[in-house]
């Protein structure tokens, strides 16, 4: 199973790239973790946000064909590390790749929300989207380590 993190936004600060890559490189070969960056639509004072969201959503959905789609969204379901480890095992047994979607400044398009099979809430707080990349990478790595009895996760 391959895990794809599909996120709106490119040219992240160096600390975001380094933080994400620190956890990305730790994933096992049989579970590659890939970042796909979707260019953010141009926002300005008179920007058509609805159109921008629609374009970003189409690009995100085209990047995750035939994958299990999971959105990262505040109204989603919060998972403990143990619950995330169980989800990870269930996803592996499903036989499909997993696409985790992180929206841009205005969130996810209605099309992305409609296509999702699961919605995961990291926190009731609104988190900066660049930071979410690192939190998701670490959380998934921790869940993998728990499910494989790797010493990274300690209770």
Swiss-Prot record:
Q: What is the scientific name of the source organism?
A: Histophilus somni (strain 2336) (Haemophilus somnus)
Q: Could you give the subunit structure recorded for this chain? A: Homodimer.
What are the subcellular locations of this protein? Cytoplasm
User: Which cysteines does the record link by disulfide bonds?
Assistant: none
Protein task: Specifically methylates the pseudouridine at position 1915 (m3Psi1915) in 23S rRNA.
Q: Enzyme class, one word?
A: transferase
**UniProt catalytic activity:** pseudouridine(1915) in 23S rRNA + S-adenosyl-L-methionine = N(3)-methylpseudouridine(1915) in 23S rRNA + S-adenosyl-L-homocysteine + H(+)
Q: Name one GO cellular component term.
A: cytoplasm
In terms of Pfam families, this protein maps to: SPOUT_MTase
One GO MF annotation is: rRNA (pseudouridine-N3-)-methyltransferase activity
Binding of S-adenosyl-L-methionine: at which residues? 72, 103, 122-127
Q: What is its main location?
A: cytoplasm
According to the lineage, what is the superkingdom?
Answer: Bacteria
Q: Name the Gene3D superfamilies for this protein.
A: 3.40.1280.10
Query: What protein name applies here?
Result: Ribosomal RNA large subunit methyltransferase H
Q: Which UniProt keywords apply?
A: Cytoplasm, Methyltransferase, rRNA processing, S-adenosyl-L-methionine, Transferase
Report the family membership: Belongs to the RNA methyltransferase RlmH family.
Q: Which InterPro entries match?
A: Alpha/beta_knot_MTases, RlmH-like, tRNA_m1G_MTases_N
EC numbers: 2.1.1.177
PANTHER family reported for this sequence: METHYLTRANSFERASE, RIBOSOMAL RNA LARGE SUBUNIT METHYLTRANSFERASE H
């Amino acid at each position: 199973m391959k895990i794809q993190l599909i996120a709106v936004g490119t040219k992240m600060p160096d600390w975001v790239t380094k933080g994400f890559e620190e956890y990305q490189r730790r994933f096992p070969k049989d579970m590659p973790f890939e970042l796909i960056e979707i260019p953010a639509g141009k926002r300005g004072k008179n920007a058509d946000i609805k159109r921008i969201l629609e374009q970003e959503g189409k690009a995100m959905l085209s990047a995750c064909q035939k994958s299990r789609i999971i959105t990262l969204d505040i109204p989603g379901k919060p998972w403990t590390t143990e619950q995330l480890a169980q989800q990870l095992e269930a996803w592996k047994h499903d036989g499909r790749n997993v696409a985790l979607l992180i929206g841009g400044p205005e969130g996810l398009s209605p099309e992305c929300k409609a296509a999702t099979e699961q919605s995961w809430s990291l926190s009731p707080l609104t988190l900066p989207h660049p930071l979410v990349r690192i939190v998701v990478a670490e959380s998934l790595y921790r869940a993998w380590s728990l499910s494989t009895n790797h010493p990274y996760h300690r209770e």
